[in-house]
C-alpha cells in the first residue's frame, strides 16, 4: 500500500493533478465546455499548481479542494475552450515561471513565450486565447493586482494583448455588477491621497464610467469634489500637468471652469475660492494663478492683469513691493510669463 505522506512533493503534485483531470473528464463526458468570460471559473484551479510550496497543503484538504473545484467547473461549463487546454495554459504559465517576473511582466520574454504558446494551442482566434491568458493571470494574481499590473504596463510589442486584457477585465467588472466606486477602490486611485491625477490606473477608471449618458470627465470632477474642495482640486490639476495623465488634467481644468461658470461664479469670487487672496506677496508665484487666468479669459468680460493691479492696490502693495514680486516671479518656471506681461503692462510697453 502506498503511503501518501512518503511521496515526494513533485510526485504528489503530479498524482493529484492526474486524479483531478481524470475525475473531471469522467463527470463531463459529452459536456459542452465552450466560451465565456467568468473569472470565477478559473479561480478554482489555482490550487492545482505542482510547485514545491503546494506540497505542504494538508493532503485531505488538497484532494477535496481539487475535486470540488473541478465539480464547480463542470457545473458552470463556461470556459473559453476545453478544461484540459486551459490546464495546459496554466501549466505552461508555471513552467515558464511567469509569476516570478517582478517588474514589467508584459514586456518580459517569459510572458511573450507563454502568450505565443497560448495562441498556438488555441485554434479559434485571438480573443479566446486572450481570455485564457486573462483567466490564468487573474487566478494567479487576483483581479485587483492584475488590474494594477495592466494599468502600469509599459508600451511594448505586446500592446495588443494588454489592450485586449484590459477590455476583458472591463467586461468582467460590468458583468459582476461592480460600481464606479468599486473599480476606483480596486485600482487604488485614492491610495496616494491627492495624487489621483498622476495614478496610471486613472484612464482605466474613466473608461469604465464612460457611457452614452455619462461624461467621464464630469464624473471624475464629481468624484474628486466628494473628497476635496476646489482649491485642492486645482492644485491636483497643476501638479499633474506634465505627468502621465496630462491630457486628462487639461480636460479636468476645463470641466472645473465650466462648473464655476454654470454656477455664475465671478472672476474675483473664483480668486477667493482658490484662496489667491491669501497669497500676499507670493501671489505671482502661486501655481494655481494660471488656472484663474484661464477662467478670466474664458469669461471674456475682464482683463486679468487689470484685475490683478486692482487687487494689489487693495492689498496695500506699493510699486516697490510689486516690483520685487515681479522680479522674483520672472525666475519661476511656471508663472514667468505672467510676471513678464504684467511688467510690460505697468511700464506702458
UniProtKB/Swiss-Prot annotation:
Keywords: Host cell membrane, Host membrane, Membrane, Secreted, Signal. One of its GO terms (cellular component) is host cell plasma membrane. Its main location: secreted. Residues 1-33 form the signal peptide. This is RxLR effector protein CRE15. GO terms for biological process: symbiont-mediated suppression of host apoptosis; symbiont-mediated suppression of host MAPK cascade. The RxLR-dEER motif acts to carry the protein into the host cell cytoplasm through binding to cell surface phosphatidylinositol-3-phosphate. Effector that promotes P.infestans virulence in Nicotiana benthamiana and potato. Attenuates cell death triggered by the pathogen-associated molecular pattern infestin 1 (INF1), indicating that the effector suppresses pattern-triggered immunity. However, it does not attenuate cell death triggered by a range of resistance proteins, suggesting that it specifically suppresses INF1-triggered cell death (ICD). Targets host MAP3K VIK in order to utilize or promote its ability to negatively regulate immunity. It comes from the Eukaryota. The keyword Ribonucleoprotein does not apply. Interacts directly with the potato ortholog of vascular highway 1 (VH1)-interacting kinase (VIK), encoding a predicted MEK kinase (MAP3K). Belongs to the RxLR effector family. Induction: Expression is up-regulated during the biotrophic phase of infection on host plants. A motif (RxLR-dEER) lies at residues 46-62. It is found in: Secreted; Host cell membrane. It comes from Phytophthora infestans (strain T30-4) (Potato late blight agent).
